[in-house]
């Protein structure tokens, strides 16, 4: 297994949305162990017990419980953190739930992305933004190999479609707010 040199993150201020979820918890643990100064912003953990609780992530990061749809609280938390790196994982990730409540899914996955990108746009501290989505953003062609980033976006269900929209919002921000000398936006 390849070993990664994580020394780059030593002392870096990193803002992680969705830090109480499974992926976000592991990401925060790795970043904290690498010496990053991590601020997490998320809803309460979705299960109890959760990895976030079991691994005691709150001890490793500045944990803020908040809703990505609440721009005022998000912005206040973001401004206080003054991050150099933003890793956006916050989402409504359950396909079945997206059918039951599509409005909430779109509000969280699309407008939540808009909200965090507005925080980035209105700051001078961020150098890198990563929007973590899913392979479900691509048109499902039922083939045996994995999808590539140049595949056609689609979204057959509200979850997948909302994550495709999130990709498009990030792409638009790349065109309109990204300054090559200051900020890299990646989705």
Cite the ranges covered by each PLM segment.
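Single conserved hydrophobic/aromatic residue that forms the stacking wall/gate
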Residues: 175-187
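N-terminal Rossmann-like NAD(P)+-binding domain of SDR-like oxidoreductases, especially those catalyzing
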Residues: 1-178
